[in-house]
């Protein structure tokens, strides 16, 4: 059983603030949770293989390949107007002023 003092310490560590009348309820709930965890700890799982997924499907692996991800040239090919050349050089979109 978790005491009120332990419950207050846990609440403080979790940065929770409880009224005094709630601390007893909190300690009871924590005790119940700890009892459930203790029951789970008693289960013998030595011969059970750990799950990596809840489904039986296997993840298909693929070879890692290095590809060029610099799409800026394609992107800036769409820039038109007087600022197109400068936009391609500095790799920025040049727009009219929108905030005064």
UniProtKB/Swiss-Prot annotation:
Keyword Ligase found: yes
SUPFAM superfamilies cross-referenced by the UniProt entry: Glu-tRNAGln amidotransferase C subunit
Enzyme class: ligase
Disulphide linkage map: none
Molecular function terms, GO-annotated: asparaginyl-tRNA synthase (glutamine-hydrolyzing) activity; ATP binding; glutaminyl-tRNA synthase (glutamine-hydrolyzing) activity
Coiled coil: none
Highest rank taxon of the organism: Bacteria
Keywords (A to Z) from UniProt: ATP-binding, Ligase, Nucleotide-binding, Protein biosynthesis
The UniProt record lists the keyword S-adenosyl-L-methionine: no
Annotated EC: 6.3.5.-
One BP annotation, GO: regulation of translational fidelity
Family affiliation: Belongs to the GatC family.
Assembly and oligomerization: Heterotrimer of A, B and C subunits.
Protein name as annotated: Glutamyl-tRNA(Gln) amidotransferase subunit C
Upper lineage: Bacteria, Pseudomonadati, Pseudomonadota, Alphaproteobacteria, Rickettsiales
């Amino acid at each position: 059983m978790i005491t009120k003092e332990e419950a207050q310490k846990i609440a403080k560590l979790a940065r929770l603030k409880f009224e005094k009348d709630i601390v007893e309820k909190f300690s009871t709930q924590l005790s119940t949770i700890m009892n459930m965890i203790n029951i789970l700890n008693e289960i013998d799982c030595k011969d059970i293989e750990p799950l990596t997924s809840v489904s039986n499907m296997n993840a298909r692996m693929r070879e890692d390949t290095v590809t060029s991800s610099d799409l800026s040239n394609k992107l800036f090919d769409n820039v038109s107007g007087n600022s197109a050349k400068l936009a391609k050089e500095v790799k920025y979109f040049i727009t009219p002023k929108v905030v005064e």
